[in-house]
Amino acid sequence: MTDFADLTLDELRIALAPDIAASAIFDGWNETALVAAAEMAGADVDVAKLAFPGAKPMDMIAAWIASVDAAMEAEWPAERLATLKIRERIRTLVAFRLEAVTHIDEAVRRALAVMAQPQNAARSLKLGWHSADIMWRLAGDTATDYNHYTKRAILAGIYSATLAVFVNDDSEGKADTYAFLDRRIDGVMKFEKAKAQFLGKDRELPSLTRFLGRLRYPAR
């Protein structure tokens, strides 16, 4: 059992986040859910309120997302994923995140509604980007060029779109959600393959600069 008295406020936020999400199913992301979570976990309610000043929904949602990130990293470290193909690494990580929220669909739905509000858009994008970055790093991505950014932007888009399907999916075992996820990942993999082939061909094309140089200084 967690001894909440020994936790820093940052640690307390992460520790309480899963229980807040569970309470948000019924109460929404608000102070009622925060108090219920603290009581459920056996934490001091006043300290819990100190960890989440004003019980702001986005603060609680951000802590919840961070808790899912941490659980994902603990369950699927890079070494464990290394034996899988890149497609399966990404799918495994996204699937883990979906499984982590399988029984709290309504909390996810409410969270997405809060995150979609105009005043929360920038922070929501940042949170999505951060989670996508963690997934790519666990998958072994070391890109530092423009691919670093495009990969994360695309994965964040896939994940958010999959969550939108997830909260409305009544199929057994969320089969429709996983089918949607597979189609999106397959589409990206085909695009990446085509892009790699195109860039490979591009590298084989004669250099215009080299060609002009030869015209100016013909070989002897």
Residue ranges and their predicted role:
Residues T2-D46, F52-A62, A66:
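Short, amphipathic alpha-helix enriched in basic
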Residues E79-T83, R137-T142:
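Acidic/His metal-coordination segments adjacent to aromatic residues that form catalytic metal sites
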Residues A71, I86-A100, L127, S131-L138, ...:
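C-terminal ligand-sensing/allosteric alpha-helical core of TetR-family HTH transcriptional regulators
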Residues Q119-D141, T150-A156, S160:
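Amphipathic alpha-helical packing segments from all-alpha helical-bundle domains
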Residues L98-S131:
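Internal, conserved structured core segments that host functional sites
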Residues D10, I14, A74-R110:
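Hydrophobic alpha-helical connector segments
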Residues D141-A156, S160-R203:
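Hydrophobic/aromatic-rich alpha-helical bundle segments in the mid-to-C-terminal region
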Residues K193-R220:
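Long, charge-rich low-complexity segments
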